[in-house]
């Protein structure tokens, strides 16, 4: 064997040593140790070619180049006569990646981070990268207070230079905060300051936000909260001098000490605005007014800056710069605020684009826009477009993005990015509701028919007390000005006694047509005409029913038919932030109808529904909801409102915890009537001369219902499904009464004209917008009820109801 000369040291990992510095001409290049890497690929990565004259520097560059490919753990370059011998040791290939012991970090997240670092199945194993990942993961655990955590990479060799990579986690437990000390505070007590922190050394049972488990990120947020607390109260010189986080020897306890300098309180002496105000100095001056002697307030200063930006944004200045510089006068303890404004260029909208609307037509979204193409960019108009899209109810999320046009100094494109939700379904199936029993459903319900914005429904249902079918169509943009046109035809066979109501059967059919007129962004009016035919039978005489029949001149009959024509009207105020599962805003809906000439009945009826959502955190995860429902109706010209038009309460949509429609006046059957009351055998004849009290609800011509709910984050639900599931704690109350009840005539029975007989319940509810339709579950406990009321703690409904 020929004498081999060792040429140069292998960089970083291992090498040979240079024995000669003279150059030589390479006649051939030979590799040893290649397995997975092709010879051609290795040659391409080298700066040396056959025929080149090489020296020590060339050899060093060759080694560097081979290491730079990431394919080799070791590289040696040797000379064998005129042949360059390259000895390599390839890095092993990763055959599999597994995890063990990780609970805080999910497998999918770990895989994403590993892939971002180039660690994936089929790639070479870089031990340096693995070591960095180990340290990075341990640092993450330390940042969330798990100081005893460890992460170890276990590499198991396999045949053909392959390895299995396994990351073994020992997460340990989170260190608990033992004590938080604030040093240097004189104006406020430590307890008062800590009460605004997320991290706490003591957490009362009612505090759902506080946390004793240490997290570095939360501490940073709490320190910023502390800074803002002082700056908002005039302490312009406030400073956090240092923060010490001490760990107990067993790594299970944390002591936090925050050293601060409060300084003195300062008052604002004035605000001076300078710069390019784009001709809006008067409006900006209004935004910067201060009260004499007002304390310096950091939050108000930030809000003032934001208000100036919003003002300029409404006039097309999309990227204004607003900078406040406080000039502190320590002598008289005042601050003069200098505000420099640079409005920048005025921008115009070149195009408005929509992304993600795979079903909805562009025209359906575009007609909701208030920002026009070719006009200057108005941030308020862009936001209005987002609000209107959200209120349609077609989308899970709506986001906006303003993109500058390349090469143009004053043009932007406005992009609305939507995520569509299922706005309808074709269904044929069986459902069950505690109010309706077994239900058979068939139909098509689509709120965004073929992406046109039309609401179309062909629906039918059959349950224990009702057979119902309906065809409905609504065009929300019957005219380009937003006038809507809707209509429906329906048929209903209603067995009242099976719905916990007084005994009668009503077969009805009808139609109605309604026009809607937008007044402004949030208000609209409705007007329309309707026709309904009611055919009643099997009427068992009871006081409220007889009173109506007597007013119609039909006293004593057990069957009756009426044809009514109605003028229908309504008003809606809607400022909710989205069409389903709102978290902010209010909605008011007033509906009414009155019979018109040609009708057998003469009456009017009004209903008012309100809902107000108030978020109590920035993320809108915690929301307070208040709802009310009011109803009143009465006869006209000596006639009574039909008893089958009465208001009812009880059930999942009014007062939960009570059976559907059971709250309020009960039937007092006349002598000779047959009652389905539980106190009697079915259809036993009433023999009392003054009538027989029953538990059958008859409703009333007046109703009041209120509900207060605390909407909470749904536990055990991932963020992916957060927009389709909602949980809440609620308190319901309601009453139904009959203003025409003659208490003096029936002294032996409850006074059903008294509106003070309020029922109350409290409980928990879960709503899920499932692929089958809305699922609503509730559990409520009535805590104020009256004789004859029927409790039903657990209630649920599956599928769409009509």
Swiss-Prot record:
Residues 1-20 form the signal peptide. Pfam families: Omp85 (PF01103), POTRA (PF07244). InterPro entries: Bac_surfAg_D15, BamA/TamA_POTRA, D15-like, OM_assembly_BamA, POTRA. Disulfide bonds: none annotated. The keyword Signal applies. It comes from the Bacteria. Keywords: Cell outer membrane, Membrane, Repeat, Signal, Transmembrane, Transmembrane beta strand. It is found in: Cell outer membrane. GO terms for cellular component: Bam protein complex. The keyword Transmembrane applies. Residues 24-91, 92-172, 175-263, 266-344, 347-421 form the POTRA domain. GO terms for biological process: Gram-negative-bacterium-type cell outer membrane assembly; protein insertion into membrane. Part of the outer membrane protein assembly complex, which is involved in assembly and insertion of beta-barrel proteins into the outer membrane. Constitutes, with BamD, the core component of the assembly machinery. Part of the Bam complex, which is composed of the outer membrane protein BamA, and four lipoproteins BamB, BamC, BamD and BamE. HAMAP family: OM_assembly_BamA. Belongs to the BamA family. This is Outer membrane protein assembly factor BamA.
């Amino acid at each position: 064997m020929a004498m081999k000369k060792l040429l140069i040291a292998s960089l970083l990992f291992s090498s040979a040593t240079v024995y000669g510095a003279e150059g030589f001409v390479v006649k051939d290049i030979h590799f040893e140790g290649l397995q997975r890497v092709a010879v051609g690929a290795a040659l391409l990565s080298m700066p040396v070619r056959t025929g080149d004259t090489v020296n020590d520097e060339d050899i060093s560059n060759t080694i560097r180049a081979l290491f730079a490919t990431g394919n080799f753990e070791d590289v040696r370059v040797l000379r064998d006569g005129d042949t360059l011998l390259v000895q390599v040791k390839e890095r092993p290939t990763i055959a599999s990646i597994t995890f063990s012991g990780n609970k805080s970090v999910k497998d999918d997240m770990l895989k994403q981070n590993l892939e971002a670092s180039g660690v994936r199945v089929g790639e070479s194993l870089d031990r340096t990268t693995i070591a960095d990942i180990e340290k990075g993961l341990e640092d993450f655990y330390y940042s969330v207070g798990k100081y005893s955590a460890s992460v170890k990479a276990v590499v198991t060799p396999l045949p053909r230079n392959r390895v299995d990579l396994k990351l073994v986690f020992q997460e340990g437990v989170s260190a608990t905060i033992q004590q938080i000390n604030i040093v240097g505070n004189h104006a406020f007590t430590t307890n008062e300051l800590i009460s605004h922190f997320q991290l706490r050394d003591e957490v009362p049972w009612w505090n759902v936000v506080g946390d004793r488990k240490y997290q570095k990120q939360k501490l940073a947020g709490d320190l910023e909260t502390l800074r803002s607390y002082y700056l908002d109260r005039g302490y312009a010189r406030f400073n956090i001098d240092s923060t010490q986080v001490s760990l107990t020897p067993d790594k299970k306890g944390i002591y936090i000490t925050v050293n601060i300098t409060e300084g003195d309180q300062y008052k604002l002496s004035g605000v001076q605005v300078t710069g390019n105000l784009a001709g809006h100095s008067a409006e900006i001056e209004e935004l910067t007014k201060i009260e004499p002697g007002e304390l310096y307030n950091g939050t108000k200063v930030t809000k003032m800056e934001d208000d100036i930006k919003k003002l300029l944004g409404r006039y097309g200045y999309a990227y204004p710069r607003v900078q406040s510089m406080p000039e502190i006068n320590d002598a008289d303890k005042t601050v003069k605020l200098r505000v420099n404004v640079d409005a920048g260029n005025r921008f115009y909208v070149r195009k408005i684009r929509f992304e993600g609307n795979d079903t909805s037509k562009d025209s359906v979204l575009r007609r909701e826009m208030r920002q026009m193409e070719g006009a200057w960019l108005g941030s308020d108009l862009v936001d209005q477009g987002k609000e209107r899209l959200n209120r349609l109810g077609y989308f899970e999320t709506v986001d906006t993005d303003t993109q500058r046009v390349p090469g143009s100094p004053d043009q932007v494109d406005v992009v609305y990015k939507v995520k569509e939700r299922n706005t309808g379904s074709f269904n044929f199936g069986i459902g069950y509701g505690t109010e309706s029993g077994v239900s058979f459903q068939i139909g098509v319900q689509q709120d965004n028919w073929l992406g046109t914005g039309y609401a179309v429904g062909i629906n039918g249902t059959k349950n224990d007390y009702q057979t119902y079918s309906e065809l409905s169509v609504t065009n929300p943009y019957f005219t380009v000005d937003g006038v809507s046109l809707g209509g429906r035809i329906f048929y209903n066979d209603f067995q009242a006694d099976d719905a916990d109501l007084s005994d009668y059967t009503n077969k009805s059919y009808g139609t109605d047509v309604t026009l809607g007129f937008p007044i402004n962004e949030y208000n609209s009016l409705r007007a329309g005409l309707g026709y309904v035919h009611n055919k009643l039978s099997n009427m068992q005489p009871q006081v409220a029913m007889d009173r109506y029949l007597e007013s119609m001149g039909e006293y004593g009959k057990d069957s009756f038919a009426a044809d009514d024509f109605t003028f229908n009207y309504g008003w809606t105020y809607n400022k909710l932030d989205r069409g389903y599962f709102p978290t902010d805003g209010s909605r008011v809906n007033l509906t009414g109808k009155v019979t018109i000439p040609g009708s057998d009945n003469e009456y009017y009826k009004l209903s008012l529904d309100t809902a107000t959502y108030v978020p109590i955190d920035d993320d809108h995860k915690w929301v307070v909801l208040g709802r009310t429902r009011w109803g009143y109706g009465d006869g006209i010209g000596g006639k009574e409102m039909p008893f089958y038009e009465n208001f009812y309460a009880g059930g999942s949509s009014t007062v939960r915890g009570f059976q559907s429609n059971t709250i309020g006046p009960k039937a007092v059957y006349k002598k000779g009537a047959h009652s389905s009351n539980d106190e009697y055998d079915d259809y036993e004849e009433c023999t009392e001369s003054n009538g027989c009290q029953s538990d059958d609800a008859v409703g009333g011509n007046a109703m009041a219902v209120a509900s207060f709910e605390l909407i909470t984050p749904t536990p055990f639900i991932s963020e992916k499904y957060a927009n389709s599931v909602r949980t809440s704690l609620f308190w319901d109350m309601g009453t139904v009464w009959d203003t025409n009840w003659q208490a003096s005539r029936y002294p032996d029975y409850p006074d059903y004209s008294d509106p003070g007989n309020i029922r109350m319940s409290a409980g928990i509810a879960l709503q899920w917008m499932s692929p089958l339709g809305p699922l609503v579950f509730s559990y409520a406990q009535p805590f104020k009820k009256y004789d004859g009321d029927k409790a039903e703690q657990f209630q649920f409904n599956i599928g769409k109801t009509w």
